[in-house]
Structures are given as structure tokens and as C-alpha cells.
Amino acid sequence: MAIDLRPFIPFGRGALSQATDPFRAAVEFTLMPMLITNPHLPDNPIVFANPAFLKLTGYEADEVMGRNCRFLQGHGTDPAHVRAIKSAIAAEKPIDIDIINYKKSGEAFWNRLHISPVHNANGRLQHFVSSQLDVTLELSRLVELEKERKTLSIETARSKDQLDYIVEVANIGFWTREFYSGKMTCSAECRRIYGFTPDEPVHFDTILDLVVLEDRMTVVQKAHQAVTGEPYSIEYRIVTRLGETRWLETRAKALTGENPLVLGIVQDVTERKKAEANKALVSREIAHRFKNSMAMVQSIANQTLRNTYDPEQANRLFSERLRALSQAHDMLLKENWAGATIQQICATALAPFNSTFANRIHMSGPHLLVSDRVTVALSLAFYELATNAVKYGALSNEKGVINITWAIMEDKGEKKFHMRWAESRGPEVMQPARRGFGQRLLHSVLAEELKAKCDVEFAASGLLIDVLAPITPEVFPGMGHNVPEQRIA
């Protein structure tokens, strides 16, 4: 039904207060700011403004009556909003719009404006009625929220980029799995780790088929436990489609609910597992070498104390022999405990004597690498034999010499290692009542380690020791078949 406002149009503020119509009184005294304009007058001027409007804008009634509403606009008003209002008025259609208006004080505010055309019973336009509502606080809060949303969006994007970078650098793949269906989504790194193509659909069974049989049941059990919502971690092996065995570590947790979703990461830890295995191997090897070293020290101590009755002499001999043992170990450390060549062993063990007898100690032979245990035994033996040579043998006079030679020779159709310690031009030697430490090393340790035959001759020309041993990979690691045969003269 059209509203007939003609009875109060000629009146300004207060005109409605004299009316008895409750509707008219409500328009004047409502707390909602309201205006009525007359489109039949030039420039569609204001013909009614209620007290709520005057209070909102700060104007007096006589300052607004007869003026077009555009006086509320200012430099901050969006021209697009103004055009939208003009179009609605021209089309005699209602409009709802938020627009920046200005109070008499110059203060800007967001005005939630509603304009409706009022027609008479014949459908002819009579007036426009508008209501205003100051929504500055609301829209300001919305603006702040939008700023916060944009800031949060930027931070979220930045965090995602950082996470993607970290995941890429750390070579971590991530995946999700629908618990009941087994369908999975996988990141690019996850697909690379498992060997899947970029577009290949992935199912939990697809991954399970790659897991080695020994680990498969454990993987299945852990996957089923995920429905509890407790996080789990597991290491297992897969065999890729290229036939490579890889160690993987998976950490996951399920988002519980009607349709649980398992979220997880996977990382290739093959190199770490290799390092752990190598570490364990090294630890066992260190323990083994330590045990051997202690056994050697104990043997040196027993041999020294058993055959030396003077405490000071025993202490000196024991210290010298430990020093020789230490030099042998230093040599092995430089070679990463891979053994040493006989040339290196001779040079190291006889280094203390070379400064005095350099021109009287000669060594020759092919490049032959021997094991670490043989290295230690030979080092101690050479040191002891040289010490005895200084005391009683070829190095105890001015003319004696020592020749140390080694070679590969043929013996009864088998290649063997032959080493000789030959002293000459020294004083005449006689077989002692008991064997010295050096000879005992040659007979016990070398004979045991090399499976060697050791002959000792106290010739008139000097001490002569011949060692003949089979060629075995345990004693001669990396021994090639191209070492030329050479017979020691």
C-alpha cells in the first residue's frame, strides 16, 4: 500500500508532532536518522529531517531544509557510490549503499544509506524516504579485519614458502592417507623417494608392495595403530622399481573422526643407516685392535721381566719396546689401519739407528702391503734385532752391515714370500743360551700370523734369518698376481 505523506510535506521539523497518526509520530521521533525529499521540486530537495538525523550530522533544521543531500558528500566520497545513488533515483528504485558522508564539523563517517521511492495510490512518484546509520566503527573494524586477514594471508604464504624450502632442503616428503580407503596424496619429494611418477595415483598398497618382506608386517601394524590418534615413527626398507634397497623413516599421526586422515612425512635415511653400520663396525674394530694391542703390551712386559733381572734395565727395555710399538701404531694410523708396506715398516722401526748407522743398514724389495698385526710384529722384531746388532752383532764394530731383503718366489709350484735379515762383517757370533725378544717375536708372532717357516743361523759371518711364508689375502691384503718373482741371492 502506498503511503500518503502529503499532509506533512509542507511542514518542517516538528510538523509531525502535531499529527495524531502514530506512523507520522514514529517517523519524527525514531532514533533512526531519516530524511524525506521531494523529486517534484528543483534538485530534489530535503523537505523533512527528523531530530535523529540532525543529531547525527550536527546541522540545524534550517541548514538542511531545501538542500539536496549531496552537501553531505566530500573529498573522501567515492564517485562510484554517488553515481549508483543517482542511477537509483533516476530509475525510481530503492538502493542500499555504504557511502562516506561528512558531518557539519567536517568529521567523516560511513553512512549506511537506504533510499526508497514513495508512490501514491495511482503509482505516481511522490517522495523519496531515506534512512541513515553511522556504521563507521563497524566498517573500520571490518577494514582492520581485512588488513589483518591480508597480513595473515601474507604471513601464511611466507610460512608456507619457508616450510616448502625447509622440506626441500631437508629432502623430506609429506603425504596424507585416507585411513579406510587407503588413498594417498604425495608431495613431489615423497614421490621421488618412493620412485613414483608425478601423475601416478598412489595407494597405501602401492607403497606396501615396495616394502621388503621382513619389514612389511611392522609397517602394516604401525599403519593400523594410527587410528588411535597417537603419533608413530618407523624405519623400514623398500626395494625401488630400479632394484635399489633404501632405508626410509616415516613419522605420522592421524586426525581422528568419522573418516580419519593420516598425515605423515617420509625421509630417505639410507646414508644415515650406512653411517650407523660403519660406526658399529669401527667400534668393533677398535675394540678388536685395543684387545690386540693390550695383548702385545702384556707379551712385551712378560718377555722383558722374565729375562731381565735388573729393575732399571727392565724399565729401560720396556720403555724402548713400548716406544717401538707406539711408532708402529702411528704408522698404522697414517694408513687408516690398513697395514703398511715392508719398506715403511723397515724405515720406521730402524729410524732411531739410521742417524748413526745410515750407510750400514740396507733394505730392498718389491712394494708389498702386509696386515696391521704383521706390521706391529715386524716393527718390534726389526727394532729388537737392530738393538741386538748394536750390542753384539754387525753394528757393534765399525765395518759391519745389515741387509734386509724380501721378494716373491716360487716354491714347489706355489708363490711364497721370502724375507731375509743378514748381518755381515761384524764380530763372530755364537748362538746364545736363550733366544732374545726379537727372535721370539719372529718365531711366535710371525710364524703364527704368516704361517711362516723361520730359520735362524748364527753363522761365522753374522746372524742370518730367513722367513718363508705362503701368500694369503689375510696377511697380504690387496696382493696382486702381477708382482714379479724375485729370488733373494
UniProtKB/Swiss-Prot annotation:
<keyword id="KW-0067">ATP-binding</keyword>
<dbReference type="GO" id="GO:0004673">
    <property type="term" value="F:protein histidine kinase activity"/>
</dbReference>
<keyword id="KW-0418">Kinase</keyword>
<dbReference type="GO" id="GO:0005524">
    <property type="term" value="F:ATP binding"/>
</dbReference>
<protein>
    <recommendedName>
        <fullName>Blue-light-activated histidine kinase</fullName>
        <ecNumber>2.7.13.3</ecNumber>
    </recommendedName>
</protein>
<dbReference type="Pfam" id="PF08447">
    <property type="entry name" value="PAS_3"/>
</dbReference>
<dbReference type="InterPro" id="IPR001610">
    <property type="entry name" value="PAC"/>
</dbReference>
<keyword id="KW-0547">Nucleotide-binding</keyword>
<dbReference type="GO" id="GO:0009881">
    <property type="term" value="F:photoreceptor activity"/>
</dbReference>
<keyword id="KW-0677">Repeat</keyword>
<feature type="region of interest" description="HWE histidine kinase domain">
    <location>
        <begin position="285"/>
        <end position="367"/>
    </location>
</feature>
<dbReference type="InterPro" id="IPR035965">
    <property type="entry name" value="PAS-like_dom_sf"/>
</dbReference>
<keyword id="KW-0157">Chromophore</keyword>
<keyword id="KW-0808">Transferase</keyword>
<dbReference type="Pfam" id="PF07536">
    <property type="entry name" value="HWE_HK"/>
</dbReference>
<keyword id="KW-0843">Virulence</keyword>
<keyword id="KW-0285">Flavoprotein</keyword>
<keyword id="KW-0716">Sensory transduction</keyword>
<comment type="function">
    <text>Photosensitive kinase that is involved in increased bacterial virulence upon exposure to light. Once ejected from an infected animal host, sunlight acts as an environmental signal that increases the virulence of the bacterium, preparing it for infection of the next host. This photoreceptor protein is directly related to the bacterium's survival and replication within host macrophages.</text>
</comment>
<dbReference type="Pfam" id="PF13426">
    <property type="entry name" value="PAS_9"/>
</dbReference>
<dbReference type="InterPro" id="IPR011102">
    <property type="entry name" value="Sig_transdc_His_kinase_HWE"/>
</dbReference>
<dbReference type="InterPro" id="IPR013655">
    <property type="entry name" value="PAS_fold_3"/>
</dbReference>
<feature type="domain" description="PAC 1">
    <location>
        <begin position="93"/>
        <end position="147"/>
    </location>
</feature>
<feature type="domain" description="PAS">
    <location>
        <begin position="19"/>
        <end position="93"/>
    </location>
</feature>
<feature type="modified residue" description="S-4a-FMN cysteine">
    <location>
        <position position="69"/>
    </location>
</feature>
<keyword id="KW-0600">Photoreceptor protein</keyword>
<keyword id="KW-0288">FMN</keyword>
<feature type="modified residue" description="Phosphohistidine; by autocatalysis">
    <location>
        <position position="288"/>
    </location>
</feature>
<dbReference type="InterPro" id="IPR000014">
    <property type="entry name" value="PAS"/>
</dbReference>
<keyword id="KW-0675">Receptor</keyword>
<dbReference type="InterPro" id="IPR000700">
    <property type="entry name" value="PAS-assoc_C"/>
</dbReference>
<keyword id="KW-0597">Phosphoprotein</keyword>
<feature type="domain" description="PAC 2">
    <location>
        <begin position="232"/>
        <end position="281"/>
    </location>
</feature>
